[in-house]
């Protein structure tokens, strides 16, 4: 019987927990962002073969079976109840509150388009504010993707239908 995503995720998180290492420590040792490392352990990202060797060196408890599962394309999904978790709720609230302004600035700086969440890097960092208190820095670093003008002459499917 196939293992569920939740069961596999729990096994992966147990390996991380047993290592005593944080996502940021694993990230530093593998050359990945801390959020990407968390995505790997939550089966939201695919582990690439060259990175698998680095991850195994950092976490020797990862079995060949677990590494193999991490290298399979994941089912990227989330629990809809996750929004009720306070940190996730506040992050969503911040994006929704600032979203329209961020969109306008993207349009001013780049033109009509979006920030990719595919060619995308994300990290979470801890810094001290000017008042000496801890602050959370969430960085979204995504490739700019312009919207295409939909000209029929560029529509490959239509070109093929017309014998071109």
Curated annotation (Swiss-Prot):
Pfam families: Cyanate_lyase (PF02560). The active site is at residues 90, 93, 116. Its EC number is 4.2.1.104. Coiled coil: none annotated. One of its GO terms (molecular function) is DNA binding. It catalyses: cyanate + hydrogencarbonate + 3 H(+) = NH4(+) + 2 CO2. GO terms for biological process: cyanate metabolic process. Keywords: Lyase. CDD domains: Cyanase_C. The keyword Lyase applies. InterPro entries: Cro/C1-type_HTH, Cyanase, Cyanate_lyase_C, Cyanate_lyase_C_sf, Lambda_DNA-bd_dom_sf. The keyword Lyase applies. Belongs to the cyanase family. Catalyzes the reaction of cyanate with bicarbonate to produce ammonia and carbon dioxide. NCBIfam families: cynS. This is Cyanate hydratase. The lineage of its organism: Eukaryota, Viridiplantae, Streptophyta, Embryophyta, Tracheophyta. The gene is CYN.
């Amino acid at each position: 019987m196939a293992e569920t995503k939740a069961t596999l995720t729990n096994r992966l998180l147990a390996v991380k927990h047993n290592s005593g290492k944080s996502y940021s420590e694993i990230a530093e040792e593998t050359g990945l962002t801390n959020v990407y490392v968390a995505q790997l352990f939550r089966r939201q990202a695919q582990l690439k073969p060259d990175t698998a060797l680095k991850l195994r060196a950092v976490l020797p408890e990862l079995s060949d079976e677990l590494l193999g599962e991490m290298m399979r394309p994941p089912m990227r999904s989330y629990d809809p109840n996750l929004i009720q978790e306070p940190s996730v709720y506040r992050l969503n609230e911040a994006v929704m509150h600032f979203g329209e302004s961020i969109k306008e600035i993207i349009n001013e700086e780049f033109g009509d388009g979006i920030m990719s969440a595919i060619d995308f890097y994300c990290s979470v960092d801890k810094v001290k504010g000017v008042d000496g208190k801890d602050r959370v820095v969430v960085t979204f670093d995504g490739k700019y993707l312009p919207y295409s003008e939909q000209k029929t002459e560029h529509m490959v499917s239509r070109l093929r239908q017309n014998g071109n």
